[in-house]
UniProtKB/Swiss-Prot annotation:
Component of the axonemal radial spoke complex 1 (RS1), at least composed of spoke head proteins RSPH1, RSPH3, RSPH9 and the cilia-specific component RSPH4A or sperm-specific component RSPH6A, spoke stalk proteins RSPH14, DNAJB13, DYDC1, ROPN1L and NME5, and the anchor protein IQUB. May interact with AKAP3. Interacts with FSCB; the interaction increases upon spermatozoa capacitation conditions. Interacts with CFAP61. It comes from the Eukaryota. The gene is ROPN1L. Functions as part of axonemal radial spoke complexes that play an important part in the motility of sperm and cilia. Important for male fertility. With ROPN1, involved in fibrous sheath integrity and sperm motility, plays a role in PKA-dependent signaling processes required for spermatozoa capacitation. It comes from Bos taurus. The keyword GTP-binding does not apply. This is Ropporin-1-like protein. Keywords: Cell projection, Cilium, Flagellum, Ubl conjugation. Residues 17-46 form the RIIa domain. GO terms for biological process: flagellated sperm motility; regulation of protein phosphorylation; sperm capacitation. PANTHER family: ROPPORIN-1-LIKE PROTEIN. The keyword Ubl conjugation applies.
Length: 218
């Protein structure tokens, strides 16, 4: 025989007083992040919330990127979310990183394709994964570096997007090293010229205006 439905009285149902605020914050986060799969994202959100981890939430709503050549689903905003969740570690476990990727409703085949650019075993240096993600957004090496600066900077949005030159040069060498068409001598000559400007004017920092020129259509 089927078991009878369990009945609860009002005194037995405990609703924590903070639930209303939790749901308000969740709703705001969902609106900002606009997840493709709300159920998947919600599971990741509340899992992170229960552990006290950084939440998979964008800082703001993103408009679609017309310049992205392939529809990977990946955006600068989502990379920034991953950076918040992973940057406290120098190396991240691929299994944990893949789960965070899935929680943002990104296709897992794109995650694996990204790792094929620089295959590794169980872990990857976070800054390298971030660099690969920036390169996946499309465009040139300088465009990838632009995305990197805008993610890593502590400057206000729309500001110079400065980061330490040491970080910039490390990532630039890494990405250029993955491209067999870029001679190492060209990379070093380019970084040397940028370093002189950074040392002279920026206190060891480099910003977008030092290397990135937006081409305007006439």
């Amino acid at each position: 025989m089927p078991l009878p439905d369990t009945m609860f009285c009002a005194q037995q149902i405990h609703i924590p007083p903070e639930l209303t605020d939790i749901l308000k914050q969740f709703t705001k986060a969902a609106i900002r992040t606009q997840p493709a799969d709300v159920l998947q994202w919600s599971a990741g959100y509340f899992s992170a919330l229960s552990r006290g981890d950084p939440l998979p939430v964008k800082d703001r709503i993103e408009m679609p990127m017309a310049t992205q050549k392939t529809d990977t689903g990946l955006t600068q905003g989502l990379l920034k979310v991953l950076h918040k969740q992973c940057s406290h570690k120098e190396y991240v476990d691929l299994a944990d990183l893949e789960q965070k990727w899935k929680n943002l409703c990104l296709p897992v085949e794109k995650f694996r394709a990204l790792l094929q650019l620089d295959p590794c075993e169980d872990k990857i240096e976070w800054i390298k994964f971030l660099a690969l993600g920036c390169s996946m957004l499309g465009g040139s090496l300088n465009t990838a570096m632009k995305h990197l600066c805008e993610i890593l900077t502590t400057d206000p949005e729309g500001g110079p997007a400065r980061i330490p030159f040491g970080t910039f040069s490390y990532v630039y060498r890494y990405l250029s090293g993955l491209d067999s068409d870029i001679p190492e001598s060209d990379t070093e000559a380019y970084l040397s010229s940028l370093k002189e400007n950074a040392a002279a004017r920026k206190n060891g920092m480099i910003g977008l205006s030092d290397f990135f020129v937006l081409k305007r259509k006439i």
